[in-house]
Amino acid sequence: SIIVDDKEVTTLSNREVPELRRKIGTVFQDFRLLPKKTVFENVAFAMEVLHKSKRQIRKQVPQVLSLVGITDKAHKYPDELSAGEQQRVAIARAIINNPTVLIADEPTGNLDPITAAEIMDLLEQINMRGTTIVMVTHAKDIVDRMKKRVIAIEKGKIIRDEEGVYGFKEGVNTLE
């Protein structure tokens, strides 16, 4: 079962799904930024679709851009940013509405090792502020570095579910 905010998500009604969706932020490997919008506008868009006030947007967007370290890029367009900066914009957009859960699908997949480490540090900061991070990755070095709960899935079956045991070696620590 999957439980978010004390609700079993597989039994939610169609009416309840949008409410739950507002509590989940999503970050993709390919950033999925809106190319004709600035950094500020990309992040603000996530608030606009929830009908947040312009005042709230003007206040919160700079705060989140500061948190992810790209305040100086607010008026740039996605094609003017490095891959790491684009991922920071995607993370800012995902967390602007204070989600309970952040789903990160290969958030370091298109990044060089140094930038990937910086993004992982940023996700760690977000987690320490109270957001649960669910990350999909094939980067075993990141799994080992983060030292968090690891759930490995192979061919649709959970083969590992551990916390506190690290070292991602082939054939080791799998469930029977």
PLM features per residue range, with description:
Residues 91:
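Hydrophobic anchor residue at the start of the ABC signature
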Residues 102-105:
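Catalytic Walker B motif of ABC-type/P-loop ATPase nucleotide-binding domains
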Residues 77-81, 85-87:
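Conserved ABC ATPase signature
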Residues 1-19:
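ABC ATPase NBD Q-loop/coupling interface
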Residues 76-79, 97, 129:
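Conserved signature/switch motifs of ABC ATPase nucleotide-binding domains
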Residues 113-115:
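Helix N-cap at the start of a conserved alpha-helix in ABC-type nucleotide-binding domains
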Residues 37-44:
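Short coil-to-helix segment of the ABC ATPase nucleotide-binding domain corresponding to the Q-loop/switch region
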